[in-house]
Amino acid sequence: MIEYIKLFWEGAPEGEPTVILYEVDTENERLALRSIDIFADGHTRNIPDLYDGAIEITPIPTVEELNAHVWGEEFRACVIEKAEFEAIWESRTYNGELKGTGEIG
Protein backbone atom coordinates (compact mmCIF):
# COMPACT_ATOMS: atom_id res chain seq x y z
CA MET A 1 0.00 0.00 0.00
CA ILE A 2 1.18 3.50 -0.76
CA GLU A 3 0.76 6.32 1.76
CA TYR A 4 1.28 10.02 1.05
CA ILE A 5 2.58 12.24 3.86
CA LYS A 6 2.94 16.01 4.15
CA LEU A 7 5.59 16.95 6.71
CA PHE A 8 5.88 20.51 8.04
CA TRP A 9 9.32 21.46 9.41
CA GLU A 10 8.90 24.45 11.73
CA GLY A 11 12.03 26.57 11.96
CA ALA A 12 13.78 24.74 9.13
CA PRO A 13 17.31 26.11 8.62
CA GLU A 14 17.79 28.47 5.69
CA GLY A 15 18.14 26.54 2.46
CA GLU A 16 16.21 23.54 3.81
CA PRO A 17 12.61 22.71 2.82
CA THR A 18 9.81 23.88 5.12
CA VAL A 19 7.44 21.22 3.75
CA ILE A 20 8.34 17.74 2.51
CA LEU A 21 5.94 15.40 0.74
CA TYR A 22 6.65 11.67 0.80
CA GLU A 23 5.28 8.78 -1.25
CA VAL A 24 5.77 5.86 1.17
CA ASP A 25 5.62 2.14 0.41
CA THR A 26 4.07 0.80 3.62
CA GLU A 27 4.69 -2.79 2.51
CA ASN A 28 8.42 -2.28 1.93
CA GLU A 29 9.72 -1.14 5.34
CA ARG A 30 8.10 2.32 4.93
CA LEU A 31 10.69 3.36 2.36
CA ALA A 32 10.03 6.47 0.28
CA LEU A 33 9.43 5.93 -3.41
CA ARG A 34 9.55 9.66 -4.24
CA SER A 35 9.58 12.92 -2.33
CA ILE A 36 9.09 16.62 -2.98
CA ASP A 37 10.94 19.37 -1.11
CA ILE A 38 9.02 22.65 -0.83
CA PHE A 39 10.96 25.73 0.21
CA ALA A 40 9.88 28.91 2.03
CA ASP A 41 9.98 30.91 -1.21
CA GLY A 42 7.55 28.43 -2.79
CA HIS A 43 9.90 26.66 -5.18
CA THR A 44 9.88 22.87 -5.23
CA ARG A 45 12.39 20.11 -5.90
CA ASN A 46 11.22 16.69 -7.07
CA ILE A 47 13.32 13.80 -5.77
CA PRO A 48 12.67 10.63 -7.80
CA ASP A 49 15.00 8.50 -5.62
CA LEU A 50 15.40 9.71 -2.03
CA TYR A 51 18.07 7.10 -1.38
CA ASP A 52 20.29 7.81 -4.41
CA GLY A 53 23.80 8.14 -3.00
CA ALA A 54 22.62 7.50 0.56
CA ILE A 55 24.98 5.78 2.95
CA GLU A 56 22.13 4.59 5.17
CA ILE A 57 18.55 3.92 4.08
CA THR A 58 16.06 5.07 6.70
CA PRO A 59 12.32 4.34 6.71
CA ILE A 60 9.87 7.25 6.83
CA PRO A 61 8.20 7.55 10.26
CA THR A 62 4.43 7.30 10.58
CA VAL A 63 2.28 10.42 10.88
CA GLU A 64 1.53 9.37 14.46
CA GLU A 65 5.25 9.16 15.33
CA LEU A 66 5.94 12.53 13.73
CA ASN A 67 3.05 14.22 15.55
CA ALA A 68 4.05 12.60 18.87
CA HIS A 69 7.39 14.43 18.47
CA VAL A 70 9.37 11.17 18.49
CA TRP A 71 11.60 12.78 15.82
CA GLY A 72 11.55 16.32 17.27
CA GLU A 73 9.21 19.08 18.39
CA GLU A 74 9.59 20.92 15.08
CA PHE A 75 7.78 18.33 12.95
CA ARG A 76 4.05 18.05 12.21
CA ALA A 77 2.57 15.74 9.62
CA CYS A 78 -0.66 14.67 7.97
CA VAL A 79 -1.73 12.13 5.38
CA ILE A 80 -2.61 13.59 1.99
CA GLU A 81 -4.28 12.20 -1.11
CA LYS A 82 -2.30 10.77 -4.02
CA ALA A 83 -3.87 13.41 -6.28
CA GLU A 84 -2.33 16.25 -4.25
CA PHE A 85 1.13 14.66 -4.40
CA GLU A 86 0.85 13.98 -8.15
CA ALA A 87 -0.41 17.50 -8.93
CA ILE A 88 2.58 19.08 -7.18
CA TRP A 89 4.99 16.55 -8.73
CA GLU A 90 3.70 17.22 -12.25
CA SER A 91 3.29 21.01 -12.00
CA ARG A 92 6.37 21.61 -9.84
CA THR A 93 4.38 24.30 -8.04
CA TYR A 94 2.96 24.49 -4.51
CA ASN A 95 0.46 27.07 -3.34
CA GLY A 96 -0.45 25.46 -0.04
CA GLU A 97 0.34 26.07 3.59
CA LEU A 98 4.04 26.36 4.53
CA LYS A 99 3.55 25.99 8.29
CA GLY A 100 1.74 23.27 10.16
CA THR A 101 -0.70 24.90 12.55
CA GLY A 102 -2.52 23.27 15.40
CA GLU A 103 -3.14 19.57 15.48
CA ILE A 104 -2.73 17.86 12.15
CA GLY A 105 -3.62 14.29 11.49
Which stretches of residues belong to each language-model region?
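Short, extreme N-terminal segment that most often corresponds to the first beta-strand
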Residues: 1-19
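Short amphipathic alpha-helical "recognition" segments used for binding
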Residues: 7-10, 27, 85
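Intrinsically disordered, low-complexity segments enriched in polar/charged residues with Gly/Pro
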Residues: 8-10, 23, 64-66
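Short, well-structured alpha-helical interface segments that form or flank functional binding sites
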Residues: 17, 31, 80
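Broad, structure-driven detector of short, well-ordered beta-strand segments within folded domains
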Residues: 18-27, 105
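Acidic, aromatic-enriched beta-alpha/helix-loop junctions
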Residues: 26-71
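Short, compact, well-ordered microdomains
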Residues: 60-105
